């Protein structure tokens, strides 16, 4: 189970789905993508991308190690692209408030690359505790930036890389 908290857009969830499919992990992975409002939830569930944007993304896809054609993962109709149903069905979209809602599941991975910069120090600490409480031991946490030494949960994680906000929960 992977929680994608407050993705920047539907493309972030679709990118994760494609990555997991290429690594042969998608069939046994559930992605929970949460957004802060019902309006965003509606938009994400119905979203499409212009085919031209998909074509422009092909070079970035190849540069990041993508295999084959990016368009192989999409239905194309009327100048729009939508992720294939077999990939969309493993993404559960839900409305969720990072500040006020409680943990709703235990995850092996949590990715939050966009929302934390919007929060002040107190709310950031609350959300980081929520992520710790929702992440299984040895689960992976991906954040927008590295932990600060003053972050309440910093001792619960081990960095996965020298630079960047990727961590493994160790306690």
Tell me the role of every PLM-derived stretch.
Residues 17-21, 132:
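A structural alpha-helix within SAM-dependent methyltransferase catalytic domains
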Residues 22-27:
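Short helix-capping segments at alpha-helix termini
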């Amino acid at each position: 189970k992977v929680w994608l908290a407050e993705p920047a857009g539907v493309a972030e969830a679709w990118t994760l789905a494609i990555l997991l499919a290429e690594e042969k992990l998608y069939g046994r992975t559930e992605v929970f993508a949460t957004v802060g409002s019902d309006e965003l939830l509606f938009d994400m569930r119905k979203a499409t991308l212009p085919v031209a944007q998909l074509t422009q993304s092909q070079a970035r896809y190849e540069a990041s190690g993508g295999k084959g054609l990016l368009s192989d993962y999409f239905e194309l109709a009327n100048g729009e692209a939508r992720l294939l149903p077999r990939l969309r069905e493993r993404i559960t979209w839900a409305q969720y408030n990072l500040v006020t809602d409680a943990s709703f599941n235990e995850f092996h991975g949590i990715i939050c690359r966009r929302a934390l910069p919007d929060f002040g120090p107190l709310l950031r600490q609350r959300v980081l505790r929520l992520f710790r409480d929702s992440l299984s031991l040895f689960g992976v946490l991906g954040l927008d930036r590295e932990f600060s030494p003053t972050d309440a949960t910093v001792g619960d994680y081990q960095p996965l890389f020298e630079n960047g906000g990727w961590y493994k929960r160790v306690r």
